[in-house]
Design a protein with these regions (language model features):
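Helix-biased detector of long, well-ordered alpha-helical tracts
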Residues: 1-196
Length: 196
C-alpha cells in the first residue's frame, strides 16, 4: 500500500510513536503503551505506567496533549478501589506533565495491565527518531540502565529499600526536560529505553 505523505514516522523504523503531519508547523504524535505491575503499590504502578507511556511522546521530541487510559483488570479477584488507586497514579503523572486524560477503555483480564494511548504534538522539522541517529554521535542517557533487573529483585523481595526507592524514582520521573534539551541542542535521534 502507498504511504500517505502526511505519515512522517510509521512502522518502518520501529520508533516509539507514529507522527502524522498536520501542516508545516504541526504534527501529531501518537503512541500506546501498557505494562503489567512492576510494584505492589497500585498508585505507584499507575505512575510508572503513565510515565512509561508518555515517555514515547518525549522520545519523539513531542509534547503530550491528552491520553486515554488502557486497562486490563481482573474483576473477579481485584477490588475496584485498587483500580481507583491505579488510575489516580496515572492522573498524578498527567497533572505533572500537563496533559489531560480524556477517557479510556477497560477489559476483563486475568493479568492486570495499565497504560495509555497518548496523543501529542511536535514540529515536523524537529522530530527525533531512531533512524535519525548517526555514527560518531555521542549517546546520552537521561536515566540509568538496569531498572528491569531491579523490578525483578523487588518482586522477589531481595531489593533493598534504598535500591527500590531509586528505581521507583527513576521510573516515575518524566523525560520532558531531557526531550526539550535534546530538541533545543539539535539532537537528530532519540529512543525510549525501557525494559520491564
Amino acid at each position: 500500500a502507498d504511504t500517505p505523505d502526511e505519515l512522517l514516522v510509521g512502522t518502518a523504523t520501529g520508533d516509539d510513536a507514529a507522527v502524522w503531519k498536520i501542516d508545516d508547523d504541526r504534527a501529531i504524535v501518537s503512541t500506546a503503551d501498557f505494562i503489567t505491575p512492576v510494584i505492589d503499590d497500585a498508585r505507584t504502578w499507575g505512575r510508572v505506567a503513565a510515565a512509561n507511556s508518555v515517555s514515547d511522546v518525549y522520545a519523539m521530541g513531542g509534547r503530550p496533549l491528552f491520553a486515554l487510559n488502557l486497562v486490563g483488570w481482573n474483576t473477579e479477584s481485584l477490588p475496584t478501589s485498587l483500580l481507583g488507586e491505579l488510575l489516580a497514579g496515572g492522573q498524578d503523572v498527567a497533572t505533572a506533565a500537563g496533559f489531560a486524560i480524556v477517557g479510556g477503555h477497560t477489559i476483563d483480564d486475568p493479568e492486570p495491565k495499565y497504560g495509555m494511548a497518548v496523543t501529542g504534538e511536535v514540529h515536523p522539522d524537529r522530530i527525533l527518531t531512531n533512524a535519525g541517529l548517526k555514527p560518531g554521535q555521542d549517546l546520552i542517557l537521561t536515566k540509568p540502565l538496569g531498572v528491569g533487573v531491579i523490578t525483578t529483585a523487588i518482586k522477589a523481595d531481595v531489593a533493598s529499600a534504598e535500591v527500590a526507592a531509586g528505581a521507583i524514582e527513576s521510573m516515575t520521573r518524566l523525560n520532558d526536560v531531557g526531550s526539550r534539551i535534546a530538541v533545543a541542542a539539535g539532537a537528530t535521534g532519540c529512543t525510549d529505553v525501557t525494559g520491564f
